[in-house]
Amino acid sequence: MTDPQEGASAAEGGRPQDVHTAGPSGGDGTMPLELPRATADELQRLELARTLLLKVHRALLEAERVRYEKARGRIENNSAFLQLVINDPWFDWLRPMAQMVLLIDERTSDKKAPVGSAEARSLFARARDMLKADPDGDAFQRLFADALQHSPTLAVIARQVSMVLHG
């Protein structure tokens, strides 16, 4: 007799390994929820989005370093700059970008709980929302909008990541 899940997966165009289990199997006879894994295209887009988000983050760090040095004086070296990025509230607004890159990293490298298709779409949506340059938005969106106005390089990279996030 054929496993009903195998038949359902094959009928939907997938293979049984295209489904992953979310949540523990209950001792009460309930089955864990099975979710479709992210497609190869979604995983590739996540990897590309991560790479481009890192480029945006680097460009923002460079732009913010210039802004900081204009306001407060020259930063001695890269080590001092790193300490400022970590500890100075001036750079707090950049944390959502770093956290998004880290989240994509963690989820795409988790072999025990692979990224699901719905989760991949959610990550794309979260990144799109974060990258909305809005002078009236949250701190990141306001300062991102300002940085885009002053850095053509950043604007080009931001456009590239936007295209990837929108599929």
Task: Describe each PLM feature range.
Residues T2-G13, D18-G167:
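Surface-exposed peri-terminal alpha-helical interaction modules
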